Structure formats: C-alpha cells, structure tokens
Amino acid sequence: MKKLLKSVLVFAALSSASSLQALPVGNPAEPSLMIDGILWEGFGGDPCDPCATWCDAISMRVGYYGDFVFDRVLKTDVNKEFQMGAAPTTNDAADLQNDPKTNVARPNPAYGKHMQDAEMFTNAAYMALNIWDRFDVFCTLGATTGYLKGNSASFNLVGLFGTKTKSSDFNTAKLVPNIALNRAVVELYTDTTFAWSVGARAALWECGCATLGASFQYAQSKPKVEELNVLCNASEFTINKPKGYVGAEFPLDITAGTEAATGTKDASIDYHEWQASLALSYRLNMFTPYIGVKWSRVSFDADTIRIAQPKLAEAILDVTTLNPTIAGKGTVVASGSDNDLADTMQIVSLQLNKMKSRKSCGIAVGTTIVDADKYAVTVETRLIDERAAHVNAQFRF
C-alpha cells in the first residue's frame, strides 16, 4: 500500500512539472514540514503538556507567493432578456420604417456565454502564523494584473443601424440601438493593482509519512481596465483607460463617447474568490509530493458598466465616427437627407457583464522541497476549472 501511494504521488508531482496549466491548494503537510527556524529552534512539544506555553506553540514563516492563471473557465452571469430597440424586419428597406426610441425585451445574446480566455497573474509576499506545527493561518499581500477575451455577444456589443433620421436632427432624436453585434471579439487588459488573500490550513491526519490536510482561502482585488479593444468589422475601436455609465438604460446621453461626456466612472472589475480544498501528501526525504481536490467560486463584477464607442462631439467633414458603410452598394447620400446615416453603425456601446466560474471543481498536483527543516519551495499545477501554476518559497524564523 505504501509503495502504491508513493508511486501515485510521485507520478502526480512529475506530471505537474511537465504541463503548466487563482488560488493554490498548497501542500497539506506544509504546517509540519518546517519544524526548525533560522532564528529560533522548533519546540516540537505536546499541546497537552501543562508546561508548554504559547511561545512554544507559535512560529512564523514568510516568503514569496506567485500564482499564474493562464486560463480560468468563466461564463457570463446575466439575465435571459436584454433591453434595447426592436430588431429591423423585412418591411424595412433602405432605412427603417420607424426609428427605435423605446426599449423592448429581447433574448440576451450574453446569456450563458463562455469566455474564450481569462488570465490573472499575482506576485505577493506570503506570511503564515503556525500553531503546534499542525495549523497555519496565512495571508498574502501583493499585486495582480489580468486579461479577458470573449465573443462580443458576451459583452452586449450593440449599435443602431438603418436610421432615417437626418444627421442634423440625430442628437435630439433620443434613439436606441437595434442591432446586436455578435460576430466580433472584445478583449481587455487590466492595470497592476493591489491584491490580498487570507486562509487557513490544517494537517488533519498523519500516518507515517502520509498527511491528509484541508484548507480554506479567500482572495480579493479590484483592478481598473487599462485598455479595451473591440475587433469588429462594423465598429472597431480601442479605448485606453475607458470610462462608462453604471446603471444607465438606453438611450445613453448623446455626449457618451466624447470628451464632453459627464457622469461617467472608471471601468474597474471587482474580483472575489473563495476556495475549500482537501489534499494528500507523502514525504520522501526532502521531497513531499501531493495531490488534492478543490471546490471554488469566483466572480468578476464590473457593475455592468456601459462604455460607448469614442466619437467626435461635433462632425468634422460630415464624420463623427470612423465606422465603415455596411451595405457596400449605392451612392453616398448627401448630408441633410433623411437617411444620410442609414448605412453606418451609430451609437455603438458595450457593457462589462458579471462573470462567474463555469466549473467549480478542480484538481491540483505539486511537490514541496524542504531543506534543513527551515526552507521550502513548492511548485503546483491546477487543472479542470483552470489552467494555472503556483510557486511558493518560504522560510521559518
């Protein structure tokens, strides 16, 4: 049985090193691996000893914490219906019979959409308070940065197409978008911002060199969106440090997307994650491989902020946006005609929808190398609900 357990854990550890896949599971035996300190010797006494004191029971560890999520499995968390203008019909020809001015409930193209890519990289300081070489209470303080990419439907990219309203009357018409642009890509990069986490880990059961342990962790961060890219043939644009409207319904203010816009706020993403895990390790001299399972929930909430396409406050050369003509036929209609804006996408906007975990369960495999019972380095890989790698280097005082 011992040989089988050794084989399984060693294989798992070696596999993790060869396939790097935002919270780590960690080694379940970590509270009891470093039993000596660089400044004070370990006590290693009995908690039931009446002569033992809290000074004997408590020790500190500090170190580096690096967590690198290459692909978190996420999906949107939105309602089934979305409020916007009515879709054009076959009765509409060169332009709309009736320009949309009121919102109607339409199927939400963002409902249940999967994100194509979600990355997060964290570098932090690690601090752990150890009790009786069995329990750890720890925290991390550092910085994180992220990247998100998905189909434009996930971000409710919408615009107005086919309007017959004259350009001279457009600013006062209070029209709403009627087209969902679902065949495009939206990506965003966040800035590097403060991140923190807290957690606890316990070695629940020990038998010889084997240890079964459990942990619970919570992490939080709120990065701002540094750059937003919309890759769409009908309306392609990039915004650095985007701002938008929170809680605003269509129509947005006609100044949205211009330098004169008011009532906007910076686009930021509130990241929360909590995780519970159970893991098994087996010590082989200085190596302690382990394998674990975890259950976690993560959310990325940007308050459903609506961000408008950049445009000019006043037309220059009869142009306010750089959106191309779409029909690809006919002649350019003179400015002032009824449908001079019908062939370009107008009042384009998107919103940053709330996202959550698409899969809650995952596995982690890793190994810890301990030197002189004072220093340790842990390398870990996580799979299924995310592809991630974790590195932790620490020492005991």
UniProtKB/Swiss-Prot annotation:
Membrane topology: Multi-pass membrane protein
GO molecular function, one term: structural molecule activity
GO biological process, one term: monoatomic ion transport
Chief place of localization: membrane
Subcellular location: Cell outer membrane
Region forming the signal peptide: 1-22
Keyword presence, Flavoprotein: no
Xref: InterPro entries: Major_OMP_Chlamydia
Keyword Metal-binding on entry: no
Subunit structure: Part of a disulfide cross-linked outer membrane complex (COMC) composed of the major outer membrane porin (MOMP), the small cysteine-rich protein (OmcA) and the large cysteine-rich periplasmic protein (OmcB).
GO CC aspect terms: cell outer membrane; pore complex
Keywords: Cell outer membrane, Cell shape, Disulfide bond, Ion transport, Membrane, Porin, Signal, Transmembrane, Transmembrane beta strand, Transport
One Pfam family, short name: Chlam_OMP
Official protein name in the record: Major outer membrane porin, serovar H
Summary of the function given for this chain in its UniProt record: In elementary bodies (EBs, the infectious stage, which is able to survive outside the host cell) provides the structural integrity of the outer envelope through disulfide cross-links with the small cysteine-rich protein and the large cysteine-rich periplasmic protein. It has been described in publications as the Sarkosyl-insoluble COMC (Chlamydia outer membrane complex), and serves as the functional equivalent of peptidoglycan. Permits diffusion of specific solutes through the outer membrane.
UniProt similarity note: Belongs to the chlamydial porin (CP) (TC 1.B.2) family.
